[in-house]
Amino acid sequence: MIDDSQIFVALLFALVSAVLAIRLGKELYQ
């Protein structure tokens, strides 16, 4: 079974990783 808390943690992790990837990409393009 998948808990609502597990879904929330997965979404939060995906959001953080996306933000880090965007920041890293911007630094590389400068």
From Swiss-Prot:
It is found in: Plastid, Chloroplast thylakoid membrane. It comes from the Eukaryota. It is a single-pass membrane protein. One of its GO terms (cellular component) is photosystem I. The chain crosses the membrane at residues 7-26. Its main location: plastid. Disulfide bonds: none annotated. Pfam families: PsaM (PF07465). Keywords: Chloroplast, Membrane, Photosynthesis, Photosystem I, Plastid, Thylakoid, Transmembrane, Transmembrane helix. GO terms for biological process: photosynthesis. NCBIfam families: PS_I_psaM. Belongs to the PsaM family. This is Photosystem I reaction center subunit XII. It comes from Porphyra purpurea. The lineage of its organism: Eukaryota, Rhodophyta, Bangiophyceae, Bangiales, Bangiaceae.
